């Protein structure tokens, strides 16, 4: 694609760079591009894992996407990842006349593209959506940590979802260059209450990636205790990921597979329908940034039970806007799920949470905050 030249007198344009991204990340990057393009000319340069539909993208954001296929071996994977970075660097060079700000929106350090963006005299920002790498201690994670430190020093600013993430992600040495902003907003005509909580079936669930950092394996292990206590209760587990087969096998072994619906991937369009069926959404994550599914559930009047990780405590105040559990052990999950389902003011908590999200996650508020961030640049 060819970028359209903006007038010399105009404010510099913004390039958003993200790679490699999967289907689940299409909403966050689409939201960010929509916010930024309401402020300035915006270009999205993305490396995608397969064909990705960028949802909710308005027409004023320009998209350039490179498809990235993970290799069958470490060597091929590294080679293909290197080629992807070279393609992104090439696009940064070709668009250098039109962009003065580059925002890298990704967890893993964009080492080479960030150096290239800096060499082109761009103001470089790193918006961190999560820090899954903190959970691993293998060699690749150690390399990621080293490259991350280099990128923290290279970039002009680091953008986080919450001040609490500074210490949680061990970023105290860079506090002087940290700004707070997020890309979260909702369409409240889509994410709304269509079925009152009292009219919903006895159904609890988890919706998200089926991977170890999400703690979904512990939720599955908690289900025998939960279901034995409530004979009419059923469970929904929505999403795909590397743990899908092992979770399905464990449900069969425990003899509860008939009461658990493993739906697979749930599209963003179908999500409100599923959320309006749940009496409780459980998020037993080890680590989070600011999970979209949390605010989407709350907007639909669905109570959320979550671990106090990332920016979750900024949104969920235990017993007021939702519920917090101490950890994600199966025993803790089971105990808290049963307590929440028996909570005498569950509908009031759900309504308070819904109002909080409606007041704090409007598109207009997100745009205003990003205007403030860009004014600091």
What is the predicted role of each segment?
Residues 1-53:
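N-terminal subdomain of nucleotide-sugar transferases
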Residues 26-34, 202, 206-225, 242-248, ...:
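A conserved mid-protein helix/loop that constitutes part of the nucleotide-sugar donor-binding site
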Residues 46, 64, 141, 145-192, ...:
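Donor nucleotide-sugar binding/catalytic pocket of nucleotide-sugar-dependent glycosyltransferases
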Residues 84-85, 101-122, 126-128:
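An aromatic- and histidine-rich active-site surface loop
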Residues 286:
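Aromatic "clamp/platform" in nucleotide-sugar-dependent glycosyltransferases that forms part
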Residues 303-306:
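Short hydrophobic beta-strand element within catalytic cores of glycosyltransferases
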Residues 318-319, 323-330, 339-344:
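Conserved acidic donor-binding segment of nucleotide-sugar-dependent glycosyltransferases
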Residues 332, 339, 345-360, 366-372:
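A short, well-ordered alpha-helix in the C-terminal region of glycosyltransferases
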């Amino acid at each position: 694609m060819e970028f359209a030249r903006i007038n010399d007198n105009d404010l510099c344009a913004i390039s958003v760079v993200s790679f490699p991204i999967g289907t689940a990340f299409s909403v966050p990057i689409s939201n960010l591009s929509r916010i930024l393009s309401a402020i300035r000319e915006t270009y999205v340069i993305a490396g995608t894992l397969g064909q990705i539909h960028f949802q909710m993208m308005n027409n004023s954001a320009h998209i350039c996407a490179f498809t990235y296929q993970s290799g069958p071996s470490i060597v091929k994977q590294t080679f293909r990842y290197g080629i992807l970075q070279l393609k992104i660097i090439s696009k940064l060079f070709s668009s250098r006349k039109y962009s003065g700000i580059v925002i890298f929106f990704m967890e893993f350090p964009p080492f080479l593209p960030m150096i290239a963006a800096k060499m082109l005299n761009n103001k470089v920002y790193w918006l961190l959506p999560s820090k899954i790498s903190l959970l691993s201690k293998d060699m690749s994670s150690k390399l990621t940590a080293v490259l991350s430190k280099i990128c923290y020093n290279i970039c002009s600013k680091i953008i986080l979802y919450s001040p609490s993430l500074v210490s949680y992600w061990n970023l105290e040495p860079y506090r002087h260059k940290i700004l707070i902003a997020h890309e979260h907003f909702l369409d409240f005509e889509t994410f709304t209450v269509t079925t009152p909580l009292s009219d919903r079936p006895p159904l609890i669930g988890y919706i998200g990636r089926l991977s170890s950092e999400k703690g979904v394996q512990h939720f599955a292990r908690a289900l025998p205790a939960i279901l034995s206590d409530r004979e009419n209760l059923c469970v929904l587990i929505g999403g795909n990921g590397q743990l899908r087969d092992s979770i399905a096998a464990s449900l069969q072994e425990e003899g509860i597979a008939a009461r658990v619906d493993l739906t697979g991937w749930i599209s963003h369009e179908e999500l409100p329908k599923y959320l309006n069926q749940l009496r409780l959404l459980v998020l037993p994550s080890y680590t989070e940034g600011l999970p979209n599914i949390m605010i989407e559930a709350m907007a639909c009047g669905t109570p959320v039970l979550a671990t106090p990780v990332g920016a979750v405590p900024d949104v969920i105040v235990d017993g007021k806007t939702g519920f917090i559990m101490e950890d994600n052990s199966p025993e803790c999950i089971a105990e808290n799920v049963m307590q929440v389902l028996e909570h005498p003011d569950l509908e009031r908590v759900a309504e308070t949470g819904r109002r909080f999200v409606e007041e704090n996650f409007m598109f207009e508020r997100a745009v205003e905050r990003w205007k403030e961030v860009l004014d600091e640049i």
